[in-house]
Amino acid sequence: MLPLNATITQIIEESPLIRTFFFDHKFEDMEPGQFVMVWVRGVDEVPMGLSRNNSITVQKVGEATSKLFELKEGDSFGLRGPFGKGFTLPAKGEKVLIIAGGVGAAPLSPYAEAAFAAGAEVNTVLGARSEEHLLFEGRFEALGTVYVSTDDGSKGFKGFVTDVLKNLDVTSYDRIAVCGPEIMMASVFRFLEEREVLEKSEFSLHRYFKCGIGVCGACCIDRSGLRVCKDGPVFSGTQLIGSELGKYSRDASGRRVKI
C-alpha cells in the first residue's frame, strides 16, 4: 500500500510534549484502537494510533516525532492504514471502564466515544505525571464519570491509576480497555489478574514496527509469537498471560530492550 499524502489542517498543543495533528483525510471505517503508519519524509515511517478519524496525537520522544513537531499547518506527511485490530465495541447497556495513562488516552478516546454511542455506560480512570499532561479529560467527561490521578497530586488523586482502581469494583464492569506507558499497563495487568477479570480486559501494545502489515515479524511478542501490527495492537488480557509485557521489547535489530 502506497502512502497517501495528508495535509495538516490544524495543530493543537495538548501539553508541552504532546500535539494533535488534524489532516485533510477521514478514515471513516477506522476501528478505535487501530493505527496508521506515518511517513515523516526524510526521516522514518512510524506507527501512531488514531485519536480521531482525521487526527493523530503525538508525543515528542525521538527523531521522527521531533521532525513532526517542526511541521506547520499546510505541511504534509504520508499515511498508510489504518492497520491492526482495534478494541471490541460493547453491547448496549454494558458497563465499560477506560484506563488511560499519558498519551495512551489518544487511542482510547475514540473508543470511549464509540462505546457511548453504542449505548454503553462509560467510566474512565485517567492518569498522567501532572495536571498539564492530562490528555482529553473533557472528551472523557462528556461521556461519564472520570477519576483523575496525577503522580504529583496537581489534580485529582495523588498517585497512580492502580491506586484509583483499588477504590473501584472492577468486577462490576463488562469490558475494560487499557492503554498507556507499558510499566503502567503491566501494573494494571497484575491488578486485574488478581481480581480474575483479565478475560474482560483489552490492552493496546506499542512495539517497534517495520512493515506494519504482519510480514516481517519484527513486532512479534514472546512467547506466543503474536504480531502486534496484525494480531494487535489490541490484545485480550488472557492473550498476554506469560508474555513479555512490562519486561522488555525489541529494537530495530531484534535485541531485547528492558522496559
From Swiss-Prot:
Keywords (A to Z) from UniProt: 2Fe-2S, Electron transport, FAD, Flavoprotein, Iron, Iron-sulfur, Metal-binding, Pyrimidine biosynthesis, Transport
Any Gene Ontology biological process: 'de novo' UMP biosynthetic process
Cofactor note: Binds 1 [2Fe-2S] cluster per subunit. Binds 1 FAD per subunit.
Record InterPro entries: Cyt_c3_hydrogenase_gsu, Dihydroorotate_DH_ele_sf, Dihydroorotate_DH_Fe-S-bd, Dihydroorotate_DHASE_ETsu, FAD-bd_FR_type, FNR_nucleotide-bd, OxRdtase_FAD/NAD-bd, PyrK_electron_transfer
Cofactor: [2Fe-2S] cluster; FAD
Binding site for [2Fe-2S] cluster: C211, C216, C219, C229
Pathway linked to the protein: Pyrimidine metabolism; UMP biosynthesis via de novo pathway; orotate from (S)-dihydroorotate (NAD(+) route): step 1/1
Keyword Metal-binding attributed: yes
GO molecular function: 2 iron, 2 sulfur cluster binding; electron transfer activity; flavin adenine dinucleotide binding; metal ion binding; oxidoreductase activity
Pfam families: DHODB_Fe-S_bind, NAD_binding_1
Gene3D superfamilies to which the protein is assigned, alphabetical: Dihydroorotate dehydrogenase, electron transfer subunit, Nucleotide-binding domain of ferredoxin-NADP reductase (FNR) module, Translation factors
Record domain FAD-binding FR-type: where: 1-89
Subunit structure as annotated in this protein's UniProt entry: Heterotetramer of 2 PyrK and 2 PyrD type B subunits.
UniProt function note: Responsible for channeling the electrons from the oxidation of dihydroorotate from the FMN redox center in the PyrD type B subunit to the ultimate electron acceptor NAD(+).
Family designation: Belongs to the PyrK family.
This protein's name: Probable dihydroorotate dehydrogenase B (NAD(+)), electron transfer subunit
Organism: Methanosarcina mazei (strain ATCC BAA-159 / DSM 3647 / Goe1 / Go1 / JCM 11833 / OCM 88) (Methanosarcina frisia)
Taxonomic path: Archaea, Methanobacteriati, Methanobacteriota, Stenosarchaea group, Methanomicrobia
